[in-house]
A protein has these predicted regions:
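Hydrophobic anchor at the beta1->P-loop junction of P-loop NTPases
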Residues: 5-7
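Conserved nucleotide-binding/hydrolysis micro-motifs of P-loop NTPases
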Residues: 40-42, 83-86, 105-110
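Short coil/loop residues immediately preceding or within conserved phosphate-binding loops
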Residues: 2
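Glycine-rich phosphate-binding loop used to anchor ATP phosphates in small-molecule kinases
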Residues: 44, 52-100, 119-124
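Conserved lysine of the Walker
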Residues: 15
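Walker A (P-loop) phosphate-binding loop of P-loop NTPases
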Residues: 12
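Conserved substrate/cofactor phosphate-moiety recognition/catalytic segment
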Residues: 19-65
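Small-molecule kinase domains that catalyze NTP-dependent phosphoryl transfer to phosphate-bearing small molecules
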Residues: 105-108, 112-137
Length: 137
């Protein structure tokens, strides 16, 4: 039975690292899975600089619907994305079978201190200048 693991959290908290470890563990158990990384998919979609709420919802819905399409074919999906938007969390819970939401959190000062990509020096950052809507459960 396929599942959708939605790995979410602010930029730089370790979502991709966690998702890669999860994928490796699933592979060891012979569970076929695919990893959808938000940064990689955003680049493919040419949405690198689109951070208005409407654009973030649009991109996150693409991730959600892609996860649904793949999981409906019996493949476990791991989505690593910021997507801290209640509307997306709600849609996922209502529309994705076997949906597991994983929130990765770290103290903001620790994130900024370890910010190798200098993301937190930019003007538009979810959780800093853009409101983050953390999952409720």
């Amino acid at each position: 039975m396929s599942k959708v693991y939605w790995v979410t959290g602010m930029s730089g908290v370790g979502k991709t690292t966690f998702a890669n470890i999860l994928k490796k563990k699933l592979n060891e158990r012979k569970i076929v899975s695919i990893l959808i990384d938000g940064d990689e998919l955003r680049e493919i979609l040419k949405k690198e600089n689109s951070y208005s709420k409407e654009e973030r919802i649009e991109v996150a819905m693409i991730y959600s619907k892609l996860a649904k399409l793949i999981s409906n074919q019996g493949i476990t999906v791991i989505v690593s994305t910021i997507s801290l938007i209640k509307e997306i969390h709600s849609w996922n819970k209502q529309n994705l079978k076997n949906y597991i939401e994983i929130l990765i959190k770290r103290d903001i000062s620790e994130i900024i201190k370890n910010d190798e990509r200098n993301i937190y020096k930019e003007s538009e950052v979810v959780g800093v200048s853009i409101d983050a809507e953390f999952p409720e459960n």
